[in-house]
């Protein structure tokens, strides 16, 4: 089961970065291998935002759609994502964001397993490179949108 953790300082506000992360339907514009993103349900409460969303990810003939439950805890600056349907046996990822001097310190953790053994083996081999590309894509997008 691949798992990893990345920490970065991104030159934008916590609010802007969180809004970008929660804008799942825009992921195909910048996230590598993301073919579509669709939010099915969104519940914005005073203390949290909860969503259910589909992401279709893949390359060439290998593409799959999975459904996740996304919870943003407003007071903690924390976004939790858990798999609730699709090809993943297990998915947990967490974004923790703290604002420091008008920048955001981001700590991203991910742990997942694909149900299909062959896909799982393929992902394990390219996981580190893929995760770096995705993390860099989020950073590049934030810089493009929020810095001058």
Regions found by a protein language model. Give the residues of each.
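Hydrophobic ligand-binding cavity/cleft-lining segments
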Residues: 1-48, 102
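Hydrophobic pocket/interface hotspot
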Residues: 17-21, 27, 53, 70, ...
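Short Pro/Gly-enriched beta-strand edge/turn motifs at strand-loop
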Residues: 20-23, 49-54, 75-81
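Hydrophobic-ligand binding "helix-grip"
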Residues: 28-29, 36, 41-43, 56-105, ...
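A conserved amphipathic terminal alpha-helix motif
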Residues: 114-148
